[in-house]
Amino acid sequence: FKLIDKEKFYQITGNQFMDLNTAFQLLSLVKTRKELLEKADKMILMPDLFNYFLTGEKKAEYSIASTTQLLDAKKGEWSDEVIEALGIPKHIFPEIVPTGTKIGTLTDEICTELGLDKIDVMAVAGHDTQSALVSVPTSEEDFIFLSCGTWSLLGTELAEPIINEKSEHYNITNEGGYGRKISFLKNIIGLWCIQESRRQWIREGNEYGFGELEIMAKEAPALQSFIDPDAPEFTPAGDIPTRIREFCKKTGQPVPETVGEVVRCINQSLAMKYRHAMEEIKECTGKDYKTVYMVGGGTQSALLCQFTANACGCRVSAGPIEATVLGNIALQLMASGDIKSIEEAREIIKRSQDIKIYEPQDKEAWDEAYERFKKILV
């Protein structure tokens, strides 16, 4: 932050500070291989690369551009101030196109090779969470969404970004989506710890299915031990169960020994982390939320859904599972005019998908455990 003040950086971009952000990747190239940037024509983000291959258009779709920490969140344009401060060549930044609009047509080469007529290509939300958000099955204006997969993203949808001292302190990000709406959200490690733990047990010769793991977790003692899923030791691949035991020992908690105890510890900790993020969101927006709309692969875990309802003290609406795919399709249909609005898209998805409802249970026990959980946060 010698190049640009951290507070100013956040005030402009409204993005959560994460090592993997595009701004820091490009800054690394500025420091080590600037000649590559000087020679480059345009920076094309990964989702936009597919559009380029299909159409030949070098554009940046708004939602994925908004995650780079190089976009002015209020203007919806590349920030000259940030780009200049980091020493990144301006010429590499392509034109930004709105989410859910036509970006071009298939190239002649593709049409000839595949025997296709000219087909329009739509700029769907390149940031998968923004596609998933389109499929949240609600008509409410104010709602909490939880897109749950390897990563979990918990937040709300706003007309304008929230960028102030409180949101900066909580490291909450503002990301763009369809209709220039803002997703005000926290990035949280999601099912990664479960997935990596399972891979470790497979390496040890125990090929448990996810259903088996859930059954074992249900039989384990409740609310005994917690981890901070976002602690740095849980990010690298490897022996997550051992790291969980070490974390619990270090923080003076009962050490989960069995497979079921480890899985229960992870699920309980995720649910508590969701509550923690939800409280920060509520504090920043000044709004209350009666339902958490949970979408994505994590909704297949009835245990995690129920724990989330218990921890957050509110109803959880779980589904659709394939939220990103459905949102992607809906955005294409909105771009073509076949669906007239995001409200219509959400209603169609709500009527066509299996949505399960979970009500909170054991409130006193979870509230008491939450106070213990907050003490072990990194």
Residue spans for each PLM region:
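A conserved helix-loop-beta module that forms one wall/lid of the active-site cleft
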Residues: 86-101
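Short, well-ordered beta-strand elements within core beta-sheets of diverse protein domains
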Residues: 68-72, 93-95
